[in-house]
């Protein structure tokens, strides 16, 4: 996998090239290793306080997640995340949900409900602000022929990564969601 430092350089390069909207079809669920922090832990109790103090000062400089988050902040970047159909402990952070209908009316939508999620690290999702789910379900023969544009978690509705990127690209403030028993359309 690419380091978060490389991802930060990628975002900076794409923005410099004039790219309007960037989407990551991966979820950043775990922090990247911080070498300075690992050295502090590995040398704990060895008695070299000057070395430990030096490493402690370097911990923020070696925080690649923080560096990546600074590059995401204020940009049209959409991060991917995953929903789960079975109940499990939620992990990470979800982006803000879309307000298609008032929260108390969400149960009336014929939108598939997901039981749990694996979101991004808080530092990254807070910086990116936008997100879209990555879920797909292949047909019995293993081919993916369709994918939902929206899914629900609790009383909140979330977009697929593709729809979230489209919304950022065209700077749409609102989407209209029309659902039916057999499917849904977004206009």
Identify the meaning behind each predicted range:
Residues 1-187:
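Non-transmembrane functional regions of envelope-associated proteins
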């Amino acid at each position: 996998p690419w380091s978060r430092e490389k991802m930060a350089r990628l975002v900076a390069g794409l923005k410099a090239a004039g790219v309007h909207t960037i989407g990551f079809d991966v979820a950043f669920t775990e922090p990247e290793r911080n070498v300075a922090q690992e050295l502090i832990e590995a040398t704990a109790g060895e008695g070299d306080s000057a070395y430990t103090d030096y490493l402690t000062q370097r911990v923020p400089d070696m925080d690649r997640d923080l560096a990546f988050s600074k590059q995401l902040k204020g940009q049209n970047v959409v991060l991917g995340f995953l929903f789960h159909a079975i109940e499990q402990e939620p992990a990470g952070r979800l982006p803000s949900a879309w307000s298609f209908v008032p929260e108390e009316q969400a149960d009336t939508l014929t939108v598939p409900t997901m039981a749990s999620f694996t979101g991004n690290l808080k530092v990254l999702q807070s910086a990116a602000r936008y997100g879209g789910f990555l879920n797909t379900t292949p047909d019995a023969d293993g081919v993916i022929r369709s994918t939902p544009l929206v899914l629900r978690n609790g009383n909140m509705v979330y977009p697929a990564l593709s729809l979230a990127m489209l919304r950022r690209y065209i700077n749409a403030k609102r989407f209209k969601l029309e659902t039916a028993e057999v499917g849904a359309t977004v206009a």
